[in-house]
Amino acid sequence: VYPSNEDMLFEIPYATTYSGSVGVVIGHKIEGSSHIAYGKSDGWYYATLPYHASFDYKDTRRDVTCAPYKWAWNDEKGYIEQVFTEWRSIYIGKWSRMWMKTPQGPNVQYSSGINWPVIRYADVLLMLAETENELHGGPTDDAREALKEVRRRAFKAEDHARKVDDYVDAL
């Protein structure tokens, strides 16, 4: 039910129509769900403005992790649209029902079937870097390369020299 990627190594599975509230309580708010194929989402959890500001402005994960918008049905236009929110309503967009490949339908309101992540490949790379650092009293080439692999996912290729290589090499 979640976006297909090779990052997830282990997760807790939930059934599509009767378990898991990830994407309902955590995720973008979705208003006007009776018209929307993705169903309802309350978006009860928010990221803070300082957390949003802690991301590099070029980090492509920022506006997914800290989504300063919700989805709302526009009766006048007849479609769902992205509506920017005030600073107190920065949703956790990573677990949005809007990322689902197959929408559950407008009547599904309290379950999403979005699996809960336990360990990602990026977690393994970061643990490798930390272990290398601790075992060898400082960063090793393997530790730097592991950290660079994680950071490469965050920035466009044209920014890698500065935002990935220069950043990691300066540590």
Language model features by range: what are they?
Residues 1-127, 132-134:
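Elongated scaffold/linker segments in the mid-to-C-terminal portions of large proteins
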Residues 170:
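Surface-exposed binding/hinge segments that line
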